Amino acid sequence: MRIAVLALQGAFIEHEQMLSRLGVEVFEVRQLADWLQPKDGLIIPGGESTTMTKLLYELGLFDPVKQAIEAGLPVFGTCAGLILLSTLGTMAVEVVRNAYGRQLGSFSVEAPFDFGSQSPASCPLPPAPCPLLMTFIRAPYIRRVLSEDVKVLAEVDGRIVAARQGNQLATAFHPELNDDTRVHEYFLDMCRNKMSSTTKG
C-alpha cells in the first residue's frame, strides 16, 4: 500500500511519521509529477486552507485531485483538509472555519468516535463509539451535512468534528498529533477495502 500525503504546507510530517509507524509506504505530493505516481490513498493535512487551495491551483493539482477523489480514491482530510474537501466540492458538508477562535485556539478533549464495523479491538463489542483523545488547533467544524451519504462519526459540544462520505474521511481535529493510531488505521482500512473491491472488479 502506498499513501500520498499532500506536502504543500502544514502538518504533513506528523502524518508521514504516523503512517511509517504503521508500516505503510508514504510519498509526498509537492507538484503534479509527484501526484502521477501510483497511490492507494491521499491524506490532506492541517495547515492554512486558503494557502493550500491557492497552491493547488497554481501547481495544476486542484482538478486532478478532485477528479481522483470523485473517481473513488480514499482521502483523509484533517482540519484544513476538512475545509479543502468542502472547497473541492467532493464532500457534502458546510464548514465553519476557525470556529473556536483564539481563546480556544488549541485544546484537547476526549469524545466518542464511531468506528462502526471497523472498530479496533480496544473498542466495546458490538461496535460502538469509542473514547478518543482529540486535539484541536484553531479548528473548523461541520455546521451541517448536505447529503444523506454523509455519516457523522464524532461530535464535541454538539458540533460535528468528524464525518465520512463514502471514500472521504474528515476530522476537524489532528489525530496525527497523538500516539493513538486508530483513526489512521480506520483510514487504511478504507484504502484496503477499495483495493480489494478494485481487484475483484
Predicted regions and their residues:
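N-terminal beta1-alpha1 cap of cysteine-dependent amidohydrolase-like domains
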Residues: 1-58, 63-67, 118-129, 181-185, ...
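Beta-strand-turn-beta hairpins that frame and shape the catalytic cleft
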Residues: 1-2, 129-132, 164-169
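C-terminal and late-domain segments of enzyme folds
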Residues: 10, 106, 139-201
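Conserved beta-strand segments of alpha/beta enzyme cores
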Residues: 25-27, 133, 151, 169
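Structural motif
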Residues: 43-45, 136, 172
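Cysteine-nucleophile active-site neighborhood
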Residues: 48-117
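Pocket-forming structural segment of enzyme catalytic cores
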Residues: 87-159
